[in-house]
Each structure stands twice: as C-alpha cells, then as structure tokens.
Amino acid sequence: MSYSNLKLFSLSSNHELAQKVAKEIGIELGKVSVGAHSDGETVVHIDESVRGDHVFILQSTSDPVNDNLMELLIMMDALRRASAASINIVLPYYGYARQDRKARAREPITSKLVANMLQIAGADRLITFDLHAPQIQGFFNIPVDHLMGSPLIAEYFRRQLVSAGDDIVVVSPDHGGVGRARKLANFLKAPLSIIDKRRPRANVAEIMNIIGDVQGKKCILIDDMIDTAGTITLAANALKELGATEVYASCTHAVLSGPAIERINNSAITKLVVLDTIEMPEERQSEKIVQLSIAHLLADAIIRIHERRPLSPLFELHLPSEQI
C-alpha cells in the first residue's frame, strides 16, 4: 500500500528502531540533518518537503535526556513552520516521567512541563510506551496513545516457559507495579506475588517481605523500567533465597545506568527481557539480557492512526516468531 503523504523521521536517540519501523511500514525514513553550533546549540534542518504531509517523529528522550528533548522540540518547530499537515510524536521512552508529582515542598512537576513544551511546539498526537505514571496522559490536551509492552513480554515467556510446562509465578517488585504485574499474570494465566519493599533513599531499596508462594517455581519479575537495577536484583536474590528455582526479570525501558550491568551479571537473574524503547550501546549489553523489538507494534500503530482505524487490537499483539 502507498503512504505518499505519511513520513517518518528519526533524530539521534533511537535511529535503529526507527529504521525497523520504516521497514515494517514499507517506507524510507525522512531526510533530516541534525548538528550543533560551536557553542553547543542544536541545529535541525529538514532536507525534503513536508508540506501537507502527516509526519511522525520517533525520538526517545533518554540519555542525554536534555539534548534529545531539545532536538525533538526544534524538529517540531521546523515541521510546523514547513506546513506539515500533522505532527505526531512517537516517544517510546518518556524522559522525566518519574517527576510526575510534588513529593516534597518546592518541587516541580517536570513531566507536566515536558507535556506543555511538546504541545506548544506543535504536537498533534503522542504515541508512547508504558509511562512510569499513567496519569501523565492527563497532562496533555491532545490524543495520547499509551501502548503496553506486556503483550510482547508475555508472548516471549509463554513460548519460552509456559509452553514447556514450567510452574511459573509473576512477581511485582513493589506495590506500585501490581497492576502491571497483574496484566502479565493474566496474559500467562499465572499466579501473582508481590514484594513489599521500603526505600530509605533514592535508588536504594530494601526487601522486607514477599507475599505469595514462590518456592519451587520459576519467577518472572516485571517493572516499567530498570535504572540502576538495585530494586530488581535485590528482588531476584530474595526470591532465590526463598526457594524459587529460577528468576527471570523483564521491563519495557532498559535505562541501565551506573552499576546496573554489574548488578545484573552478579545477581540471581537468569535472563532479563527488555524492549528496545531505549538504544542499548555495547557497554550496556550482557549475555543475560534479551532485547525484543517494538518495531512491529509501532509500525502497526502508525498505520492505524494514519488510516483512522482503532488501536485496541494492538493490546492483544503477538510477538513475531523471528524474535523468539
């Protein structure tokens, strides 16, 4: 099918994913030049006409967060001034999503500020994945398509563990992730356990109690993101000590900063299954990490939006067999 007035552009943060999405759709990536002045100012130039086109920009606001965010805002401004018919932001990873409320006095709500900036710059629609705080959708006055990674993760584990007859249990690493873990458990028709943790300070977690039976079972931990990997590795080690035969971990966003890789490699985790919402450079790779691609899902979402068809079937998506 021809998509002559549909264009997909990629900036600096996730070019490999954008190429996969373009291939799935059957189009070429749009031509854009991204550079910087000698003083560090970001410069963006669109190298082809976009007049009257429905444009999708794929850019995760991952590390370096501020540079990638500015690239995106500047690109949007250029598209708006170049008379694009619509500007659709594909933001696989929404940076600043953890700053979604005032936890203490005199703190900002930066995720709301980012939402304001995206809308002022000209966004007509946002497509994103597994927001750290789902209520961020309410910060926008434009359509937000909030896609889930759990169907992809569930299909992987269904083929790897469930089909082999393994006795599994899905585990939430904290109370806040129970809803996410319950969805995965429902997909896999597996029981659910919960880890009660107390966090004495930022990026430090202490395991207090495990609710549910994990002895003699293969456990699957799921979280929206893994940053320094303190929470997930402590959880895995605790599950192993309580008699789990194997511990698998999974997340949508593999931030993997600081000591994350070392902690994962030295932990009880057998495999960590992640999605490619964030590019994974060589120094963040490990034999324990399995990366699944969201390209097929994103391509389907873009086509459905362009053709004005519902996105609800995507929440039942099955993983393409070549990724298994």
UniProtKB/Swiss-Prot annotation:
UniProt-recorded name of the protein: Ribose-phosphate pyrophosphokinase 1
The organism of origin for this protein: Lactococcus lactis subsp. lactis (strain IL1403)
Cofactor: Mg(2+)
InterPro entries assigned to the protein according to its UniProt record, in alphabetical order: PRib_PP_synth_CS (IPR000842), Pribosyltran_N (IPR029099), PRibTrfase_dom (IPR000836), PRTase-like (IPR029057), Rib-P_diPkinase (IPR005946), Rib-P_diPkinase_bac (IPR037515)
Function of the molecule: Involved in the biosynthesis of the central metabolite phospho-alpha-D-ribosyl-1-pyrophosphate (PRPP) via the transfer of pyrophosphoryl group from ATP to 1-hydroxyl of ribose-5-phosphate (Rib-5-P).
UniProt keywords, alphabetically: ATP-binding, Cytoplasm, Kinase, Magnesium, Metal-binding, Nucleotide biosynthesis, Nucleotide-binding, Transferase
Binding, ATP: 39-41, 98-99
Cofactor note (record): Binds 2 Mg(2+) ions per subunit.
Pathway listed: Metabolic intermediate biosynthesis; 5-phospho-alpha-D-ribose 1-diphosphate biosynthesis; 5-phospho-alpha-D-ribose 1-diphosphate from D-ribose 5-phosphate (route I): step 1/1
A single GO molecular function term of this UniProt record: ribose phosphate diphosphokinase activity
Main location per the UniProt record: cytoplasm
